[in-house]
Amino acid sequence: MSTFITRNNKFNSNIQDSMESKSLCMWNLGSIILEQTTEILPKYYAIFHYVTSDECAIDNNKKQLCQHIVSLELFLNYFYSIYIVSLRGALLATNEKEQKANLKYVNAYIIEGYKALWGFTKHNQSLWGQFIKLYSKEKNTDTFDKMLDEITCALKEYGDNTITDKDERCLAMHYQIDKNGNPQELLKLDEITIEKEQERYYQFRPIYHKMIDCFVELLNYYLFKPYRTEILKIQPLLPELNIVDQLVWHDKINEINSAITKNIEAQARSFENCKEMLHKYPLMFKEISRKYKVDLSDCKELLRSSEAMLAISYFSIDLCSILKVYFNSTIPLERNIALSRMNIICHSIIDRVYGYRNRRGSYWEQYITKPFLNMELPDSVENIKNVMESLIASNTYTQEKRSSFVHLKKDNYIRAIKYLYSNSPLVEIQNSEAIIKILPEIQKAIVGVVKQVDSNIKCSYARKNSWIDEDLKKIAPYRNQPRVKSVYESLLLLKKGEIMEAINKLKDI
């Protein structure tokens, strides 16, 4: 972490000393929280199963209340850990795109956490709403009333003043805002800044601390003091988190980090190139259409391919960024949270690129195989299909597991904790590696599609745009003048259907 400030000066020169100090403090605090939570989660997971079992010796009148208290304690520790990992990943980043890939989960998980705790609607069905309703019936003291009222007010006020972004959350978790969304929506995630995400973090943090302080006292009063003997007999249910997995990679960490970083940098350049193309070319098409009365609607296919290339670059950056978090962490809980994030990312990539049940709406249908129609697919495209089918067949990416990791509502986060402690690091890493390797092949396939579309457009325009001869005759006498020369040459290219070449000739005029 000590190298964060110097390594990130290239793209964070505007961060002031106070922000850097906060970042360093946050990194160190995050380490402490994750180390503590590594001990806390197994403890409260076992207690939760005890208080929800038939063997529980707690008085029936208080049993349900204890279940809610322990459940919320579990939730708070799990939720805060996964969003601390996002911040730490951003602080570790050596590339702007890598930093933003981690930062987007701060907003996403604050939304998921708040939605589960209090909700944007239907507050009575939320974790906190149900707890308060039960507590008001079962309480035998007024000691905690003030604290509980303050938390309820804080949750209400947060909902009224939140600076979270629901569209960003959808993009972070699904790579689209709505079903069949445009890949260009991902450009919204490129606007994320560490200042904004830290502001979101600091806005929500007081609520978390109020709740943690309150539940320490509630647990002592309603559970640990009256049932101390029973609680001490509870045995752990979750296995110890893997520490052996890190030994597998120990000798190759530097090599792995270097390879991942190079891939992030290459895909970041690809992302920027696609971004520039998607910004400039529609304006150029419009200008040429207006100037020369030429129909360039066919060129939209070329832009759609650029959208797909942009998305594939983003997928690769996202997956590589969480791999770096995993390989650079020495905290078992953080590594396993990174593995769960890998699972979410890989699930979403497979879904968007290929689809699980069918290919409808996938990039496979829209971009990769569309030009081939009933033709035999090239070997490179068949290889993409084989890799995707193999990943689906591995049964690593189930909807239940994904929902547990993404949506923090009741029962989901209990399952998520169980999944967290039963991750298969080698399988997750091998599958992630397979996806990272196949994404450039998908990009090559899309380039092949672009060439095919470009060829079709050229043939079409060469046939139907003979009218350009009239414009050529008009400006031929002036074709050697500086600006006219470029226009004349671009018209010659346009006549042959070489539209992209014509645009490139004109764009610097």
How would you describe each model-predicted region?
Residues 1-163, 181-397, 412-509:
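Amphipathic alpha-helical interface segments
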